[in-house]
Amino acid sequence: SDLLTPWEKIEKRLLLASEADFVICLYNPSSKKRKDYLARACDILLEYKEESIICGIVRNIAREEESMNILTLKELRNTEVDMFSTVYIGNKMTKIIKHKMVTPRGYRYDKK
């Protein structure tokens, strides 16, 4: 949402986080006045992330109507979300395990 943060700053953060292959979370990604923001965000992310990156949408978190959907970044670009949605964009290590998005920490601790 650009209610408290200017869109230009959000764009820059998306670009840098995408380039660094961070897992990204978008809160309040759309509203009646901001319908195209998720598609614009996806276009920025697609500069560095593959179309097949795993993404998720959770709607109405912790409410009775909670729902979730796992999809690719390519599919996310054309998906409708609203102000009750939270969008998660995985990184190259993110995978689906038992219908959940999982991103390993990237290292292993081996006791000696």
PLM feature spans:
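Class I SAM-dependent methyltransferase SAM-binding "motif I" and its flanking Rossmann-like core
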Residues: 1-23
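A contiguous loop/helix-start segment that scaffolds small-molecule binding in enzyme catalytic cores
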Residues: 19-112
